[in-house]
Amino acid sequence: MTKRSKGANEDKLIETKSKNVSGKSQKQKKPVEAESLKEEDLLQASGTDSDYDGDSLPGSLNSDDFDSDFSDSEDDGTHEGTEDGDVEFSDDDDVLEHDGSIDNEDDDGSEHVGSDNNEEHGSDEDSERGEAVEESDSSEDEVPSRNTVGNVPLKWYEDEKHIGYDLTGKKITKKEKQDKLDSFLATIDDSKTWRKIYDEYNDEDVELTKEESKIVQRILKGEAPHADFDPYAPYVEWFKHDDAIHPLSSAPEPKRRFIPSKWEAKKVVKIVRAIRKGWIKFDKPEEEPNVYLLWGDDSTSDQKSKHLTYIPPPKLKLPGHDESYNPSLEYIPTEEEKASYELMFEEDRPKFIPTRFTSLRSIPAYENALKESFERCLDLYLCPRVRKKRINIDPESLKPKLPSRKDLRPYPNSCYLEYKGHTGAVTSISTDSSGEWIASGSTDGSVRMWEVETGRCLKVWQFDEAIMCVAWNPLSRLPVLAVAMGRDLFFLNTELGTDEEQEITKERLHSGNIPEPDASVAAIVTWLPDELYGGIKIRHFKSISSIDWHRKGDYLSTVMASGETRGVVLHQLSKQKTQRLPFKIRGLPVCTLFHPSLSYFFVATRKDVRVYNLLKPGEATKKLETGLREISSMAIHPGGDNLIVGSKEGKMCWFDMDLSSKPYKTLKNHPKDITNVAVHRSYPLFASCSEDSTAYVFHGMVYNDLNQNPLIVPLEILRGHSSKGGVLDCKFHPRQPWLFTAGADSIIKLYCH
């Protein structure tokens, strides 16, 4: 080991103690006497500022000096300075040996003085240490204060000639104060006066460096003092949320967590002993009074017996928008309205008329302020106040207790099959009595017959006009399909059934025995043979909007947009004749229905529904008041005592005709028009379809007990058709809890449970 490396190691140890040396001993250091070079020349050679004081411990180094000046050199044994490269050292040069100079001062106070090179090297170390002190962020590395008086108020030295004492114990005298004129001229002559700060503690002017002024500017802007500080540094997650393989602490659970506490047991024993000896006494429960007022309210009687009840006065009404100094235009009355106020009685006249002002300061004093205050005082003084008890009712108790949907199964809730083939919107569908076949009509002029289970199209009839309505004959032995389009009504032979049924059907549809109609009927309808498909065609004087079969399959009703007795006519297929209704219809008819078991006939107009008896035309009719804007469809329960009416405002009414002529329930479920409603023949189900492309399925149970009201429970919302046009028709399967829907997207869908 060379002398240089040995001295470097010792200087590294001395570096850690350099700060403590100045704080403990505070011994006065003697300047190192240079033989050939001055201190300023050494500082210039080392590349540091000349104003550095140069006080340092000879022989002590910091980490930067150790790395730069005393690192291992190359094979040639030479080393160059890292900063300027001006000072070079070689192995042949004299090196300061630290064997005897680790302690900077001897007992007699003399110092070890090295050679010229050592002095130059020591001054270089001092200058670099000064740079390290300036760059340090620690408050311990700051230049110590001259004044050693401590943290005391300077008011104590106001009357003295000095402000404290320096390190040697000498008084620090105050500077002579300049006149204001001299100080002003000095500030004008000095261009750096804005960077100077007066330190009253040391009685001197301190000039801020550029770095310090930048720090002040950052603090004024609310930024971090140091430019290198990153306030948005990436967050280091010490503990991640992911499950680790090893636990943070795998110490075993202590035994005290598995055994009962000994000290708690002692406390319990102490409390039990005190209870047994009677040291701890419990409060006896207060006995409730058994006396009460027979005809009075207990709560108010208790309050009146104790003290006079105070009822706070009612609060004043808060001002509204009309009392604003700049209200909206709709609150300001016109001249005509103001004139009408003058004609009113004083009691009916509004107490305040809104007025507009340009600003808040232009508002005058309120004229009726004193009058209203006086009237309120009279009301509070003369009018008695009564406390009214509010009835607290749980809102949940007001809701009807409906059964769970799981208990009401089966009902259609999912799409099972789609029937595709039409090119236009499907306007109407109908199922036969057996449930094996379904017929559909579309705006493309085609009528299709489908097999329900497979979705296979069995037959197609093509017409020139859009199909409005199709209806299958309810008798299974008469497979006839009624089709309405424009002004014509066709009876088509579906060619289903046995040979005997086909013979009966062909006889019914034979047009050779058509009788001559009456004169009153001839102006309305005309029976004609269907040359295209071999059936019968009935031509009406107006377009047909709805048709409905009688339960026996012989009569068929058609609805046209006409008033009085011409809007609804009845056709008899067996005799091939038409008859008008024996009563007048008030309003334009929308749709008609036959009663499922009696001889009643339902006619729905735009506002209400009227019930007629076909066997007794002179009997008074029954009128059902719907309260709807316009009726769109109607369906009757198989029992015949309940009627469902749909409207074009999205509402659906349930009528219990034995109960009242007004709706028992009104359901607002669709946001758009309801196109049709349907009731199942055997299951307690009914449904509605709308232009919003949805179909609602409900549970509607009708009880035989007349004292029990029908139960209506919403079950399912069926979606699946496109939003354009919505769902135009819906029908239930006659035997299964299935629902068919016809959409404007030319698709028929089957929903099953």
Swiss-Prot record:
Disruption phenotype: Embryonic lethality when homozygous. Residues 64-75, 83-109, 122-142 have a biased composition (Acidic residues). Residues 7-18, 30-41, 110-121 have a biased composition (Basic and acidic residues). InterPro entries: BOP1/Erb1 (IPR028598), BOP1_N_dom (IPR012953), WD40/YVTN_repeat-like_dom_sf (IPR015943), WD40_repeat_CS (IPR019775), WD40_repeat_dom_sf (IPR036322), WD40_rpt (IPR001680). Residues 1-155 are annotated as: Disordered. WD repeats lie at residues 421-462, 464-502, 539-581, 626-665, 669-708, 722-753. SUPFAM superfamilies: WD40 repeat-like. Keywords: Nucleus, Repeat, Ribosome biogenesis, rRNA processing, WD repeat. One of its GO terms (biological process) is regulation of cell division. GO terms for molecular function: ribonucleoprotein complex binding. Its main location: nucleus. One of its GO terms (cellular component) is nucleoplasm. PANTHER family: RIBOSOME BIOGENESIS PROTEIN BOP1, RIBOSOME BIOGENESIS PROTEIN BOP1 BLOCK OF PROLIFERATION 1 PROTEIN. Required for maturation of ribosomal RNAs and formation of the large ribosomal subunit. Plays an essential role in cell growth and survival through its regulation of ribosome biogenesis and mitotic progression. Belongs to the WD repeat BOP1/ERB1 family. HAMAP family: BOP1. This is Ribosome biogenesis protein BOP1 homolog.
